[in-house]
Amino acid sequence: MTNREHDSRTAVRRLVAAAAAALAVAAALAVTLVLAAAAVAQPARSHAQITVLAAASLTDVLPQIDQAPRYSFAGSDTLASQIRLGAPADVFAAANTTLPDQLYSAGLVEKPVVFTANKLVLVTPKSNPADIKSVFDLRRSGIKLLVGTATVPIGSYTRKILKNLSLSGILSNVVSQENDVRSILGKVGLGEADAGFVYLTDAKTVSDKVTVIALPAWAQPPVRYGVAVIKASTNRSDAVSFINKLLARDGQTKLKAAGFTAPKGIATAYSGG
C-alpha cells in the first residue's frame, strides 16, 4: 500500500467517525426534545380546557363566573340532541331539569343538580307599536306573537303559563316558533313581531331595545336550571370543579346580579355519580 492510499483511507475513516458522532448527537438531541415535549404536554392534558354546552339564556353570565371553559350556547333541546349523538363535551347546563334528567336516565350524564332559577316575562319592541299593556292584550286579532318551539324549555314554559292564565287560544297569533330564547328576543327587538315570551334575565340584557311586561306571579311555572357532568367527559375533575363554581357563593352572587334566583333546596356542592 502506498503512502497516498494509506492517507486516503485514514481520511475516509475519520470522515465516517465524524459522521457517526454527529448522528449520535442528533439522535440524543431528538430523544431529549421528545422527552421535553412529553413533559410539557402531560400537564396540558390534565388541565385541558373543558367544553360546556349551555342554554342560550346563560350566554352572558357563565363567562362572568368562569372564563376558562370553551362554551357552546344554544337551545337546551338542541344541545341535548348533540349529547345523544356523541358530541365531545364535559358539562351540560340546561334551562330546565327535564332534559338533564332524561339524559341521566339514558346513562349519558351523571346525576344532575339544580343550580339556579328564572321567570318569564313578555317583551315588545321598545316603541311597542301594538300598544300591548298586559298579556291579556295578546287576545287581540292581528297581534304578531313569537314563542319557543314546544320542545325547548322557553316554549314549554310559555305554554304552561298560558294554560295557567287560560290564554292558550292566543297561540293562534303565533307567527314564528324559535329554537332558543335569544332568537325570540332578537326578532322582537328588531320589530319583526309585536311581542314574545322570554326569560327575565335575557330581557335585562337588551333593555334599550325592548319593553318588558311582567306576568302574574301566581301563573309562573317553576323555571329551574339543571347541570351535570357528561359521562363521556375526558376531564371529569375540571368539569366537577366548574359546576361547584356555579354553586359557590361567588357564582350565585353573579347569577343573582344577572336576574336569576336561587330556588329553595339548591345544592351547595356537586359530586355527580
Task: Label every model-predicted segment.
Residues 35-66, 70-72, 77, 81-85, ...:
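Exported/periplasmic ABC-transporter solute-binding proteins
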Residues 19-36:
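Bacterial N-terminal signal peptides
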